[in-house]
């Protein structure tokens, strides 16, 4: 993902919040990704570049967590882009409210060629020697939790209103307290190939106490048809993981004393 990666790293290095430890993990890529990472490291000493064999997203994230030394953890995918003040807004909210988790709305960016139809049209135009038209991009903002400070129980109740949403499920629109992750040995299960972000977040939910929602979207999630989540699909694994997710929801909400209150009614 050389083109996407350069744009992503540039947006991270350009954050107005400067006290960053930027851990970049190259999970056995065979393109120019490692060279691009090294170019950025040469310009910015905050970068820690790790070149490792291909082990998958969960083991790669665990390697990053093991290296991290800051007070807070923030995730980013190499396809995506951060607004300059995104990290500043997250950290400011965390410090102001002594938050264990900060969550923000995000922008979903859908290039026209990210759909099957758009990609097929672009391929046809190229085969006919026709210059493809500039992609018409769709942008949508997503966020469900009103601005404010929430207890664990209130956050859990809100989550169950949109349990399948990216907003609650993904990593990259949140800021996590590293101490909670380390003390409770939280991480990503290598054998899980669907909703691994959500499983991590459910584990984190049990140990965090103060949750803060901010109103400003600063993360641009860009749908890329060539990304790992679109090209490496294990349908059997997904079915098995869905069963795990449903069971985990029940177990977590039972331990929180909320299962009877929130379980579906006949």
Regions found by a protein language model. Give the residues of each.
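Short aromatic/hydrophobic "clamp" motif used to bind/position activated sugar donors
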Residues: 73
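Conserved short acidic donor-positioning loop in nucleotide-sugar-dependent glycosyltransferases
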Residues: 12, 27-28, 55, 78
């Amino acid at each position: 993902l050389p083109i996407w990666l350069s744009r992503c790293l540039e947006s991270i290095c350009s954050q107005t919040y400067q006290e960053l430890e930027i851990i970049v993990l190259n999970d056995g890529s065979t393109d120019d990704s490692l060279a691009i990472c090294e170019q950025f490291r040469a310009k910015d000493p905050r970068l820690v570049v790790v070149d490792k064999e291909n082990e998958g997203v969960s083991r790669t994230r665990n390697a990053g967590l093991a290296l991290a030394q800051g007070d807070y953890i923030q995730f980013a995918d190499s396809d995506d882009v951060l607004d300059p003040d995104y990290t500043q807004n997250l950290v400011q909210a965390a410090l102001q409210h002594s938050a264990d988790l900060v969550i923000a709305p995000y922008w979903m960016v859908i290039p026209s060629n990210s759909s099957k139809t758009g990609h097929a049209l672009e391929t046809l135009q190229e085969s006919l020697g026709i210059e493809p038209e500039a992609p018409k991009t769709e942008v949508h903002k997503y966020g469900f939790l009103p601005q404010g400070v929430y207890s664990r129980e209130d956050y859990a109740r809100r989550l169950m209103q949109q349990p399948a949403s990216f907003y609650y499920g993904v990593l990259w629109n949140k800021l996590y307290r590293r101490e909670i992750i380390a003390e409770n040995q939280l991480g990503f299960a290598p054998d899980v190939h669907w909703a691994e972000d959500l499983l991590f977040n459910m584990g984190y939910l049990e140990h965090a106490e103060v949750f803060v929602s901010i109103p400003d979207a600063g993360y641009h999630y860009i749908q890329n048809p060539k990304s790992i989540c679109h090209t490496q699909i294990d349908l059997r694994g997904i079915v098995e993981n869905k069963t795990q997710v449903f069971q985990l929801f029940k177990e977590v909400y039972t331990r929180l004393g909320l299962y009877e209150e929130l379980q579906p009614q006949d």
